[in-house]
Swiss-Prot record:
GO terms for biological process: base-excision repair. The active site is at 142 (schiff-base intermediate with dna), 174. It comes from Pyrococcus abyssi (strain GE5 / Orsay). This is N-glycosylase/DNA lyase. It comes from the Archaea.
Length: 239
């Protein structure tokens, strides 16, 4: 049932949700207008890697991030976060651990020229491996796969081009997804949603884009009628 509905929504439906319903994408679009492209993409990756154990909703955190960095001159991403996180409203836990992550990934981020960003956007699986190696963590770690998703958003905004996510990158095991998975199955989230991805033809990161805003209570009123009907059907299952 859920694979059928997600298949009917499809990648183009997921794209509509990402660009018009997901507050994270809206926050990034806002920030992109107030900072240079390279710094924008670097910040988005860095922010993704510290987006855990939040003290508010993910939507609130990404808007706080976007408003904080809009128009700001960022010389060092590590130093910027050393100032930002302790004063953050929605991300105040485990600050030393999060700053350590930023420090570990900063050398990799410094390699992201506009040309390199475009190359990685054409091969997001390669980016996935590069971020995991820079951090020294498992590729399937929640924040690593999430950082690829958010890089995809940022690169799409900067390059004005849509590239679908690779099928092999798993869904981020965020609390909303974990809770929903328990409601639907006894399988592990990553395994279950990879199976749904293969059945529906919609890559796991796009499935995440469909589910995550809806689980957060996002309105579907802006969707075209046909897509809105499918989303309403999906909401009955997941909420």
């Amino acid at each position: 049932m859920i694979a059928r509905i997600i298949g009917e929504i499809g990648i183009e439906g997921a794209r509509f949700i990402e660009e018009n319903i997901d507050e994270q994408f809206k926050a990034l679009r806002y920030l992109s207008k107030g900072i240079d492209s390279e710094t924008f993409v670097k910040l988005v990756i860095a922010n993704s890697l510290v987006s855990y154990q939040l003290t508010g909703k993910g939507e609130q955190w990404w808007w706080e991030f976007a408003k904080y960095f809009y128009g700001r001159d960022v010389k060092s991403i590590y130093l910027a976060y050393k100032e930002f996180l302790p004063n953050s409203r929605f991300n105040r836990r485990l600050i030393p651990q999060k700053l350590s992550r930023i420090r570990r990934v900063e050398t990799f981020l410094s390699t992201l020229t506009e040309e390199r960003i475009e190359e990685y956007y054409g091969d997001m699986s390669s980016l996935w491996g590069s971020i995991a190696r820079a951090l020294g963590v498992d590729k399937e770690s929640k924040t690593v796969v999430f950082s690829v998703k958010m890089f995809g958003y940022a690169a799409r905004i900067v390059l004005s081009t849509f590239n679908p996510y690779p099928m092999e990158i798993p869904i981020p095991e965020d609390s909303r997804i974990v809770k929903l998975t328990k409601k639907l199955t006894n399988e592990k989230p990553r395994k279950f949603w990879m199976k749904i991805a293969r059945e529906s033809g919609v890559p796991p990161l796009h499935i995440d884009s469909i589910l995550w805003p809806l689980l957060g209570g996002a309105s579907i009123d802006s969707a075209p009628p046909e897509l809105r009907d499918k989303l309403a059907e999906l909401i009955k299952i997941i909420r």
